[in-house]
């Protein structure tokens, strides 16, 4: 009896230990989410729903298109191309040599205001056939150098405009080197129209991308000179022409803000523009234009958005009417088994 009891005790202890071991399994924890068993709604695109969807889209998009188009048409815009007219007739056979010469390049232009323009009137320069999105051009800069004076020697990404005589260029790179340098001054009836150049750049760029203690060094001291110069006594965060230029454009035709005229211009006014035709667009067959423009709640003049809304809305409305006519003329019962392939006649046989 004692041996039996002992063996029973040992056996009992063993089974207790085995039952205490936690069983492991590679089976993932059950969840209705992971097993895709959550309740779901699966809408069926019935003819009525399709017609209603297209109808609603057309009714919404067409008025939006009309509103956007009216807003765009309300913008008054004057565009004056001057790159060819500002070259003397005797130099038009070799415009590159003229623009690279040392002579004075003052040009006088006259602009007539055809429709009243309420202030502020935005002054833009427009360049065409200028690829600021070229990979080599875009990479030729150092954003860290623009923010901190500690990074002024980090110019390895700025070649070929990285240093002059071993000294770093600040700001370095082709983007800064090619800074636009045509200048404009305006007058009306012999009275000067002041151009406000404060606040023409993005506030986020001024505060975050250009340092308040970073000053130009050795800029445009090499050869050849690419574009405009900078004031060495002003930090980069205050040189807004540079900040505007450094925000590169995605397309070869682009506008950049030059300044704002804080005076109303009346219909029939004659604006005299004295400009310095300095920037070389002739080497790459580019164009230069001066643009005066007002704005609307939608921005500058751009008919594309309104036309796009009208086009899409008209297509949706046309499809809604077409489907409605087809549904009324030749209705089809939803889920009709006679339309199944095995229920259709093949070659006239059932």
From Swiss-Prot:
Coiled coil: none annotated. It is found in: Golgi apparatus membrane; Prevacuolar compartment membrane; Endoplasmic reticulum membrane. Expressed in roots, leaves, stems, flowers and siliques. Glycans are attached at residues 181, 231. Its main location: Golgi. The keyword Nucleus does not apply. The chain crosses the membrane at residues 50-70, 304-324. It is a multi-pass membrane protein. Keywords: Acetylation, Endoplasmic reticulum, Glycoprotein, Golgi apparatus, Membrane, Transmembrane, Transmembrane helix. The modification N-acetylserine is found at residue 2. Residues 1-23 are annotated as: Disordered. GO terms for cellular component: endoplasmic reticulum membrane; Golgi membrane; mitochondrion. It holds the Pfam family CDC50. The keyword RNA-binding does not apply. InterPro entries: CDC50/LEM3_fam (IPR005045). Belongs to the CDC50/LEM3 family. PANTHER family: ALA-INTERACTING SUBUNIT 5, CELL CYCLE CONTROL PROTEIN 50. Required for the lipid transport activity of the ALA/ALIS P4-ATPase complex. Interacts with ALA2 and ALA3 in a heterologous system. This is ALA-interacting subunit 5. It comes from Arabidopsis thaliana (Mouse-ear cress).
